[in-house]
Amino acid sequence: MVRIQDLSLAFNGQTLFEHLNLTLLPNEWVSLLGSSGVGKSTLLRLLAGIETQGMVQGKILFEPKVRIAWLPQKETLYPWLSIVDNVQLQAVLFGRKSVKTTEKAKMLLEKVGMAAHWHKPCSQLSGGQKQRVALARTLMQEVDLILLDEPFSALDAISRHQLQDLAFELLEDKSVLLVTHDPQEALRLSQRIFVLRSPETHQTALSAVILPEGNAPRELHQANLWTLQQQLLQELGGEQ
């Protein structure tokens, strides 16, 4: 679906990562961890086709007609718009809002448990509710690859667990690249996990792949996940 070949990124003369190679496959969750400032969020921006001020070398190759949606860490809902109009934002912005798009948006809000609030402005929502609306808007775009940048990091533990399960259920037929700082989140949701490393470690840009066993979303009490979590923490500790 997407191939990243020999990709390097530098800002103001400082190399964040170099010679990165990664292939994203259909219908798969891949998680990417790493220390702050190593370029994880910028990598998502590059995949989304958003310009960056850094110096980029290498290639990102897409299969024909691959559609991509990006859910950034920073809130992107418009507080003065209703929830349903935030979900159908593309139609609103480009003058294509219709009964059909509104009904589809309401259907997606029902899937994320927000149907009763469709008429409210987003300014009245809690953090967890906003993430549900953002997820519905992502689904509205009907894409193949979803880029998630720390989507649950601002939520309390219970809401985070609920939203993880909901996202996995609703995105089960999509490819997902998840940037997260939470090893447990990666282990619950992903088929493959990597740590992105800076060149200062004198290692390859990506760690060896970690492959959790069993079907996601997983229960964290599994003994093998505890071992993999320790492996991830050791890898991340080497990045500090």
UniProtKB/Swiss-Prot annotation:
Q: Which PANTHER family match?
A: ALIPHATIC SULFONATES IMPORT ATP-BINDING PROTEIN SSUB 2 (PTHR42788:SF19), TAURINE IMPORT ATP-BINDING PROTEIN-RELATED (PTHR42788)
Question: Source organism lineage?
Answer: Bacteria, Pseudomonadati, Pseudomonadota, Gammaproteobacteria, Pasteurellales
The residues covered by the ABC transporter domain are 2-223
Locate the residues binding ATP.
G34, S35, S36, G37, V38, G39, K40, S41
| One GO MF term attached to the UniProt entry | ATP hydrolysis activity
Q: What is this protein called?
A: Uncharacterized ABC transporter ATP-binding protein HI_0354
Question: What UniProt keywords are attached to this protein's entry?
Answer: ATP-binding, Nucleotide-binding, Transport
Pfam families reported in the protein's UniProt record = ABC_tran (PF00005)
| Family indicated by similarity | Belongs to the ABC transporter superfamily.
Which SUPFAM superfamilies does the UniProt entry name for this protein? P-loop containing nucleoside triphosphate hydrolases
